[in-house]
From Swiss-Prot:
Similarity comment text for this entry: Belongs to the cytochrome P450 family.
PROSITE patterns: CYTOCHROME_P450 (PS00086)
Record field: transmembrane: 3-23
Catalytic reaction(s) noted: (E)-cinnamate + reduced [NADPH--hemoprotein reductase] + O2 = (E)-4-coumarate + oxidized [NADPH--hemoprotein reductase] + H2O + H(+)
Organism in which the protein naturally occurs: Populus tremuloides (Quaking aspen)
Protein name (database record): Trans-cinnamate 4-monooxygenase
Binding site for heme: 447
A molecular function (GO) term: trans-cinnamate 4-monooxygenase activity
Lineage: Eukaryota, Viridiplantae, Streptophyta, Embryophyta, Tracheophyta
Cofactor(s), names only, from the UniProt record: heme
Cross-referenced Pfam families: p450
Residues annotated as binding (E)-cinnamate: 213-218, 306
Highest taxon in the source lineage: Eukaryota
Amino acid sequence: MDLLLLEKTLLGSFVAILVAILVSKLRGKRFKLPPGPLPVPVFGNWLQVGDDLNHRNLTDLAKKFGDILLLRMGQRNLVVVSSPELSKEVLHTQGVEFGSRTRNVVFDIFTGKGQDMVFTVYGEHWRKMRRIMTVPFFTNKVVQQYRYGWEEEAAQVVEDVKKNPGAATHGIVLRRRLQLMMYNNMYRIMFDRRFESEEDPLFNKLKALNGERSRLAQSFDYNYGDFIPILRPFLRGYLKICQEVKERRLQLFKDYFVDERKKLASTKNMCNEGLKCAIDHILDAQKKGEINEDNVLYIVENINVAAIETTLWSIEWGIAELVNHPEIQKKLRHELDTLLGPGHQITEPDTYKLPYLNAVVKETLRLRMAIPLLVPHMNLHDAKLGGFDIPAESKILVNAWWLANNPAHWKNPEEFRPERFLEEEAKVEANGNDFRYLPFGVGRRSCPGIILALPILGITLGRLVQNFELLPPPGQSKIDTSEKGGQFSLHILKHSTIVAKPRSF
């Protein structure tokens, strides 16, 4: 019976789509569309390009079709932009026109159909959420308030690694300890809380649920059902799992963090001057009626994924490149010892006077960009781009990884060479002052987390290189840096074992 119903549904949907296509051809506007592979009815280009739309596959398509190309993925138009000039149009010159976000069946679940800041459409709600989140998270005042905590967390990582007897011999998976550090860095800001160890049960619950959320959201496995509505019934099981994970996460955030902070606030009778952490500011906005409880939870949801995981990926990539390039690691260590003095542990203010460290961070973000396609943009209305018509509600992907790795724009881009940012690219910064290099995007929808990520990266990599010689495990000359690309993520495929030999000062 269920099979018969499914067959009828598929047949009816198929006929409806064919009719819609015919009507569209007869009545629709005549667009001058960007080039791309020839689509077929219903499926578009999906049968040709498949679900895996990672940055490297999209780069291959750009080499064939040009700096702007159109993929018809079922009912969705997907425009891929691969040049600095067109990226400037999307992100800056026409930032309002292309400033919205696309809908996605999985992200709709995890964000409550755009009740957060990152994935909401461009408009009043986005402006309100951005304003509410900026003061407690993304200002220099926040950096100065919490940088001592970041330094303490990095120091604790160093001590824990030194105490681990296996770290200096057969090696450890350093990422596990760094993950705890990143949770503590952000949970100090959010809730004035930290986790004592990797064995903390609440930390492990959070880590497991956030990891499952990332896996489900970043996978390409659900693209077919998102692109092609007649195939969506086959996604029911996947979407059910997403809904369950979302509900468990939000309940965890509410029970253990948001409600706990509310209780503390009620007992201390906090006034504005007494607000201690980000959630106090956000709950204050809720009390004023600016946002509701769901918005509060989705803000916490955003920070758990966007701030913690992306910075952790970049730290992990930076360590991997330093292990595989011992001469660069040695040069960085020499800078730290020379400019700071042996034994003087790097602090946040020190990061600004260490040019080679900053070059290492920039080069890591260039070659191993954590968000290689940025977060997708969308035009709410018909628009023009590069001399082509872009139909309303097209998904716009800026291939920021290719902008930063195109040999037409960069000298030997496949090489990990921090010196480029001290030599021919010395004026290029991570804040988007050059449209060839956009690790955090630029413009209205750029990532505000840059103000936190850069000092945390500098402090963490600096402390590790100051205190350890970082090496591949015995029997290996290098560690594996194979990539794992997602919907718009790029992390290392295998969490590597690292030998960390303590230095003596």
